[in-house]
Regions:
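Active-site-proximal beta-strand elements of phosphoester/diester hydrolases
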Residues: 204-209, 318-319, 358-362
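Short clusters of small/polar residues that mark proteolytic maturation junctions
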Residues: 17-18, 55, 320, 351, ...
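Catalytic beta-strand/loop cores that center a nucleophilic Ser/Cys/Thr
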Residues: 313-356, 391
Length: 391
C-alpha cells in the first residue's frame, strides 16, 4: 500500500506503508543511531513525535519482549528508507511491521531518509503527517500544519498513575542479555536469556517519572538504589514524606516550559535532598534553579553525540534524545556548566555549587547507545552516601 509523508512547509515524500493503516500527525525528527530501533520506538521521550531513522535498513533483527523501554511504542509514526525483508535473530518474537501494526503505529518506508534529514537540518524540526490516503496531498499538508507539539504537556500522557516501589523482587533489574564480563550469571530462562545477580540496596530513592525509561530504573537498581516511582505531578511534600535518601528526575517528552508543576516541586526540593536529573529532568532542574530553556533547531537524537567534561577534559560519546536545551546565559552565579556538547556547544551538564543537585542532558543508561557515561549512576550513589554521612 502506498503512503506519503507531508511536512508543514509543503514538502512531500512518497513511499510504501508498513505497520498500521490510517493517518497520524506529530513533530518529525531524525535519529542517527544504526541500531536500537526497538528502544527508540518505546522511549517515552518520543511521545508526540514521528521518528525518521537515518540508517538505510531497519528491522533486520526483529522485535522481542525484553528490549523495550516502556510497555508499548510511544512514537506517532516511524519513517525508514528500507524495511529489512528478513528477520535474523534468535531473540526475535515478531517482525517490525507486525509489531507496529499490533500497536496501531503507522510506518512508511521507501523514503530517502537522508534527504529528509538534510531538509530538517536546514529548515528545522517541523510538524508532519503520515497517511495511507494518498489521494489528497494538500489535505495531508494542512493536517500537518494543524498538529500541536510545542507547549503541549506530553508528560501527563506517559507518567505513572500512582506511586509504586519498582521491581520489589529485583526480577526486572536482573534481566539483561548483554554481558560485559563483570556480572555473574545466576539464572537463565528457556530461551537462553540470562540473568545476573545484583548488589544489595544501600540507598532509597524517589524517582519523579516524567516518562522514565526502563533501563534507567535497572541502572539505578544495579547501583544499589531501592527506587520508589512517583507520578510527575507529585508535590515536594509527597516526595519528602517518603523519607528517601535522594531524588531522581527522569527523562521525558516535550517542552519543559509546559511543566510548571514539576518546576515548583523540584524548586522546593533543592537543598533538602540530593538531586540528579537526566534529559528532561536536567531541563526541569535548570528551570527550578531560575534558568531558561530554548528549542533547538533540529534537536540531538542518536547514539554518537560527543560531550566534553569541562572539569576533567575527558570526552564521552553519548546517547541523546532531546529537542530543547538550557540557555547558559540564564544560569545563576551559583550554578556551573560541567559538560558541553561538542557538536554545537550547548549545555550538556550542570551542577549547583552549594547544594547536591546536578544533571546531564543525555542518557548515561544508553539503550540504545554507548556506555561511556554510565558511571554517573555510581557517582550519584556516592553523592547520596556523602549526604547521609554528613546529615
Amino acid at each position: 500500500m502506498t503512503a506519503l509523508l507531508a511536512l508543514e512547509d509543503g514538502r512531500i515524500f512518497h513511499g510504501e506503508s508498513f505497520g498500521a493503516e490510517g493517518t497520524t500527525t506529530g513533530e518529525v525528527c531524525f535519529n542517527t543511531s544504526m541500531t536500537g530501533y526497538q528502544e527508540i520506538l518505546t522511549d517515552p521521550s518520543y511521545r508526540g513525535q514521528i521518528v525518521a531513522m537515518t540508517y538505510p535498513e531497519i528491522g533486520n533483527y526483529g522485535v522481542n519482549d525484553l528490549d523495550v523501554e516502556s510497555d508499548a511504542p510511544q512514537v506517532r509514526g516511524f519513517v525508514i528508507e528500507e524495511l529489512s525483508p528478513i528477520v535474523s535473530s534468535w531473540r526475535a518474537d515478531t517482525d517490525l511491521g507486525g509489531y507496529l501494526k499490533k500497536h496501531g503505529i503507522l510506518g512508511i518506508q521507501g523514503i530517502d531518509t537522508r534527504a529528509l534529514t538534510r531538509h530538517l537540518r536546514t529548515r528545522g524540526s517541523m510538524r508532519a503527517c503520515i497517511t495511507t490516503d494518498t489521494t489528497d496531498p494538500s489535505g495531508a499538508i494542512e493536517m500537518a500544519r494543524k498538529a500541536s507539539y510545542e507547549g503541549v504537556d506530553f508528560v501527563k500522557e506517559v507518567t505513572s498513575t500512582e506511586k509504586h516501589l519498582w521491581d520489589s523482587e529485583s526480577r526486572q533489574s536482573r534481566e539483561w542479555i548483554i554481558r560485559r564480563g563483570s556480572e555473574e550469571i545466576v539464572d537463565a530462562d528457556a530461551r537462553g536469556n540470562v540473568f545476573t545477580d545484583l548488589p544489595p540496596t544501600t540507598h532509597t530513592l524517589a524517582a519523579l517519572d516524567f516518562g522514565m525509561k526502563k533501563n534507567i530504573l535497572r541502572s539505578l537498581r544495579r547501583n544499589g538504589f531501592d527506587v520508589t516511582v512517583l507520578p510527575a505531578t507529585a508535590t515536594a511534600e509527597e516526595v519528602l514524606a517518603l523519607g528517601t535518601d535522594g531524588v531522581f528526575l527522569s527523562n521525558g517528552p516535550g517542552d519543559p516550559e509546559a511543566l510548571d508543576y514539576a518546576r515548583k516541586t523540584v524548586s522546593d526540593l533543592i537543598g533538602k535532598k540530593p538531586l540528579f536529573g537526566i534529559c528532561l529532568g536536567h531541563q526541569v532542574l535548570a528551570l527550578a534553579l531560575g534558568a531558561k530553556t530554548f528549542k533547538l533547531k533540529f534537536g540531538h537524537r542518536g547514539g554518537n553525540q560527543p560531550v566534553k567534561d569541562l572539569r576533567t577534559g575527558k570526552i564521552a560519546i553519548t546517547s541523546q534524545n532531546h529537542g530543547y536545551a538550557v540557555d547558559p546565559a540564564s544560569l545563576p552565579a551559583d550554578v556551573e556548566v560541567t559538560h558541553v556538547n561538542l557538536n554545537d556547544g550547548t549545555v550538556a551538564g550542570l551542577r549547583h555549587l552549594k547544594h547536591r543537585a546536578s544533571s546531564v542532558q543525555y542518557h548515561p543508561e544508553a539503550c540504545p547507545g554507548p556506555h561511556d557515561a554510565e558511571y554517573f549512576f555510581a557517582e550519584f550513589a556516592k553523592e547520596v552516601a556523602a549526604a547521609k554521612t554528613n546529615a
